[in-house]
């Protein structure tokens, strides 16, 4: 009888845990606290969340694994861009809302000296940055 009681208690705990809702997942980036400069409204393909992985050569020969992810949303009549990037094999990270420039089919990063650009070519979205041999094709992230 004691074993049956213990078994029932465990069963009730597991059922209770399975039906309890946890907190809703945080949206990637949360809410914008800064907005983009818009010259021309963004191509609809740029909207939403996109990501890419690519190798970039550092120095003369060392390959550096990079990851980039962004989320472009519209709030009222403004556009917010949350940008997340890792480099130096994940040891360096940057994640923040950006006040970059949107000009139709492209988003230009600031300061321009880093050469960050997200752009539409055909039906695809690409990312490029200084010292990257060729643009990295991005993949849409289902939210």
Spans of features found by a protein language model:
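N-terminal glycine/threonine-rich, aromatic-flanked beta-hairpin/loop signature
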Residues: 61-102
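Short, solvent-exposed coil/turn segments at beta-strand boundaries
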Residues: 46-47, 71-80, 102-106, 117-125
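Edge beta-strand at a domain terminus
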Residues: 23-39, 92-101, 126-143
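Short hydrophobic/aromatic-rich beta-strand segments that constitute the beta-sheet cores
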Residues: 52, 79-83, 107-111, 125-129
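Amphipathic/hydrophobic helical signal segments and adjacent flexible N-terminal regions
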Residues: 2-10, 14-58, 141-143
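Short, solvent-exposed aromatic-acidic interface loops
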Residues: 57, 83-92, 113-114, 130-134
């Amino acid at each position: 009888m004691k074993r049956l009681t213990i078994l029932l208690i465990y069963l009730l705990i597991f059922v209770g845990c399975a039906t309890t809702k946890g907190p809703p997942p945080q949206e990637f980036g949360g809410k914008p606290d800064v907005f983009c400069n818009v010259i021309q409204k963004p191509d609809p393909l740029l909207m939403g969340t996109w990501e890419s992985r690519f190798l970039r050569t550092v120095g003369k020969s060392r390959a550096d694994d990079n990851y980039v992810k962004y989320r472009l949303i519209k709030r009222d009549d403004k556009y917010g861009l949350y940008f997340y990037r890792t480099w130096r094999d994940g040891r360096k990270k940057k994640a923040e809302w950006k006040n970059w420039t949107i000009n139709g089919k492209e988003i230009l990063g600031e300061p321009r000296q880093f050469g960050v650009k997200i752009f539409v070519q055909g039906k695809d979205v690409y990312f490029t940055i200084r010292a990257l041999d060729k643009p990295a094709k991005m993949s849409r992230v289902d939210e």
